[in-house]
């Protein structure tokens, strides 16, 4: 009957391993263990089904007697299965009986669990609700089952302990009997708080938690038999207490640590209570009958089952005591009623604490859920904002890259231009052309706007004058109307008096009232008219003040130019009467007339020279080429320099003449302005100077005549230029027609198309200022046009005879000459455009100086622009001269018959320019007879010489 020492070692080892496993499970709950990662991440939505099942599991706390019929049926089935398993089990040694429950444990449904609820996994700790439910069930069921156990005790002596009562069925597999069953009777001290038995881990691995939790009433029957099974008689409740340890919520390390802290406190309190119970009941423990031992076994089992911590603490202790007792079972004395009430009170306190802990756990869970949702929201918002900022930064980076590429391209372009200018020293032609075009457009726009402003100002002044006249007429009409009304009233009164009507009272009163009312109305109207007249007079005074200010400004300008009228004259001119001033003005006028005559003579000479050059050109065209092409090119290169020099001199002279004409026009305008100022100033001087008005008027008329003469001369210059261009184009066209003969060359169509293009270009140009004279024979009569049509050109030549032998050379020369003529046309067009721009600019500058509308900066910029235009025009003219010399050298030779036929035409050709000049002078008869005679004499002298 005695148990060998090795028999108690195995249960002790198993109990120690089970305790270590339970402690390890507490220290590392699910989600924080070293072997298994957490099933839920903070970002995942948690499954609330576990909480619902946990709440459903907690709901029947302490209500064991109120279980429904379904649960009772499940418990009965579990008991029947336990009885079957105990009947099948074989008897063996104490170590075999101790470990049998751990080896052959069948998992069963907990007592308080719903059939559809989630069950804890094998090796996990049971929920406190299930533990408390099992405790309450045992408390209510023990008094009823005690007699049954007593009766069935003798029949079961010597049987091995059943599955439900084996210590290996719960966590405390090696738990011994009650606290009073030791041999010496002295109570063992409770184990330290950090002590962990080995049986805990062994039982935890055995996956028999459900069997230790579910109580079976027949387990107490095994306590009657002495031997190895008697040691484990009380292990049913102890195992249930240890197997029903505090379940850890699968939520996180923080919750598990909090629960461990509270469970340690409860375990310490339960250990203290158990120690007190041992001290009270330890002395009365002795061997007794099985009947007396039954309540002793059942009563101590209630205390550790009330708290899972106490059960876990007492499990290893009881297993150690059971192993050390040598298999002797000692019956404990029946406890008194006072410790029983204390145990009940402590159990209720523990239940309240458990409820509080659950509530705290729920609040902590809710707070953790809220924190997790907030963390998820913050993370999502942070990610969204970060993504938006990243996208914006990318867009900004793309825009910056585009701008950098554009700026780099512009920088490289500017550097290339700068390097090219530094290497070659040439100005960009495109930029120059664009600037010229912009300048031309700006000038045209400014001129047009100036004209429009002048027109609008004139219209405004005319409308104001008309309004004033209409107001005066309206006032006069109103006054006349009022006078007529007064006369009509008087006539009515006279007619009434003559009739001598008798019903006077009312009519006389009305008649007496109406004259006073009419007088008041007349006075009001007159007052209104007087006010309007006063307003008109104010406007007139304001206008007069403005004119006065303007004249004073002009007078100040004149004084700054010529000095004050009353100031002493310089040393060369003795201060005297105004007659000296008049003499000076007359002298200036004579000088201007002489310069105008000289310019006219030079113009005539240049025109005659132009005609002579044209005649020489025609003569050169009629000559035959003697020799091969190489001597021809040598002659061209030799005479080219001479012709260039000659034409350059002619162009320079014409340019100087144009400048002199412009300067004279400006001087003439200044003189007229000076005379106007003198005229205005002379009105405020003494009466002794009134006799000079006639002289100043005569001088003014002479100046006007000189100005008209200069304008006519400038118009004639422009007319001659235009006629020269027209004649050149006609001559070239006729030359082409005469050279090609019957065969139609495409050059004719090109020339015609060029002429058409010129006309279209002239039409497409913006409108310029009004020209001061007719251009190009626009006002010529039919006779003059007929005479012009008779000018000697190559069209009067007879058709050429048979072609010479060198036909290919002649054709090649013709093609080269036609291309050169086309280029000459374009150059002539450019020269004409630049000359018109220059003349318009001169006129505009002269007008600006006259009216005082120009500033110093504008004057300097315009002078620079004029110089640039002069240079461009001179270069183009030089190129045109060179091209003309080249064309002259490329003339196709003619036969001797053609030269003989051409000689009589050249004789008449010498007198035609004189006839044309005389006709032009007759048409423009504004010149004096002396100038006309001088011009005719010069023409005849030139041709005779």
Curated annotation (Swiss-Prot):
GO biological process: regulation of autophagy
Biased composition (Basic and acidic residues): 141-151, 353-366, 494-511, 745-766
Signal sequence, renumbered to the chain: 1-25
InterPro entries: MTCL1-3, SOGA_CC
Keyword Coiled coil: yes
Annotated GO CC locations: extracellular space; membrane
Transmembrane segments: 913-933
Bias kind Low complexity: ranges: 1-23, 72-93, 110-126, 219-235, 328-345
Similarity section: Belongs to the MTCL family.
Name the UniProt record assigns to this protein: Microtubule cross-linking factor 3
Encoding gene (name): Mtcl3
